[in-house]
Amino acid sequence: MPDSLDQQLSSYAYHLPPERIAQAPVEPRHDARLLIAPGQTDGVQAARHQKVWDLLEELRSGDLLVVNDTRVLKARIKVRRSGGGVSELLVLEPRGDGQWLCLARPAKRMRPGDLLTLDGTAITLRVLHEDPASGGRIVQFPLDCRDAESIEALLNQCGEVPLPPYIDRHDPGDAERYQTRYADRPGAVAAPTAGLHFSDELLAALQGKGVGLARITLHVGLGTFRPVETEDLTQLELHSEWIEVNASVVEAIQQCRGRVIAVGTTSVRALEGAAQLQGGVLKPFTGPVNLVIQPGYRFAVVQGLLTNFHLPKSSLLLLVSALIGREKLLALYAEAIDHEYRFFSYGDAMWISPDAVLPGVTPN
């Protein structure tokens, strides 16, 4: 059972020196550092410091990696307002008939009825109304831009990859580097960052060892940009995100001879969300999920996790704490800072094996 501190947002604060925030990815991808969490019977001092390539020694034949195959859209676009001036839109999600929810900057200068010209084109957009739930704007795009697949060609012409605000760089290489090697289904506005560590060489080596790969889809959306502001975490609610867990994934998990390992928190949310919406049993599912995973949660599917280092007081920190324990996780973060690990999207990774998770929180 979680203690009272586990249920307070302030308990998930930690100090991160700014120089520990990764501003660029390492090359090759698998050369990122890997903090290996100790088993629950060991002290924090037993953590090991390796490279992502060393997952080859940690994973076994018969294990199954579940990855998120979402592809990041070039969703940040510049528009010229009819009254003059340039604004920025972050295109988030479709609302039907060519209408899209967008975050606007500066928002106060974008009013219902405003006409916008997509920078570098003659394409006209119209601001329809404000979205009260998000503070964003519903914007009318051309009618054929009805979903992520159909708007992607337009965004590829004039958009930019929406790197997180803590990354201060503009590099054309991000269009490729801020995608996983297996990114396939367009729709995200942020990358599932744990997957960025897998190079083609590492994926091939894991396959050669007998490690399986299954693909879910979770389009990382507005929730990524929303800080948790609820101090009492028993009252926490999260923004919904669209997922697909298809029949082939369910079958692969049912037939898995080893351990089910989630690559990233998005894979955890998809698998666990699909299960919890269907009585705790994993079945094929397509639709929105807003599952809150925090200490006290009992996992229905996931047994281990590869993850990046997350922002203080974030929902992702709560999720990882549910698996390994808040105090242990924060101690490992302190060790990572002392050892000069690189944090956040382009940063290093942590491996939480099934031996390292809290007793009784994952399926056998």
UniProtKB/Swiss-Prot annotation:
Gene3D superfamilies: QueA-like. InterPro entries: QueA, QueA_dom1, QueA_dom2, QueA_sf. Its EC number is 2.4.99.17. GO terms for molecular function: S-adenosylmethionine:tRNA ribosyltransferase-isomerase activity. It is an enzyme of class 2 (transferase). GO terms for biological process: queuosine biosynthetic process; tRNA wobble guanine modification. It catalyses: 7-aminomethyl-7-carbaguanosine(34) in tRNA + S-adenosyl-L-methionine = epoxyqueuosine(34) in tRNA + adenine + L-methionine + 2 H(+). Keywords: Cytoplasm, Queuosine biosynthesis, S-adenosyl-L-methionine, Transferase. It comes from the Bacteria. It is found in: Cytoplasm. One of its GO terms (cellular component) is cytoplasm. Pathway: tRNA modification; tRNA-queuosine biosynthesis. Its main location: cytoplasm. NCBIfam families: PRK00147.1 (NF001140), queA (TIGR00113). Transfers and isomerizes the ribose moiety from AdoMet to the 7-aminomethyl group of 7-deazaguanine (preQ1-tRNA) to give epoxyqueuosine (oQ-tRNA). Belongs to the QueA family. Monomer. PANTHER family: S-ADENOSYLMETHIONINE:TRNA RIBOSYLTRANSFERASE-ISOMERASE (PTHR30307:SF0). This is S-adenosylmethionine:tRNA ribosyltransferase-isomerase.
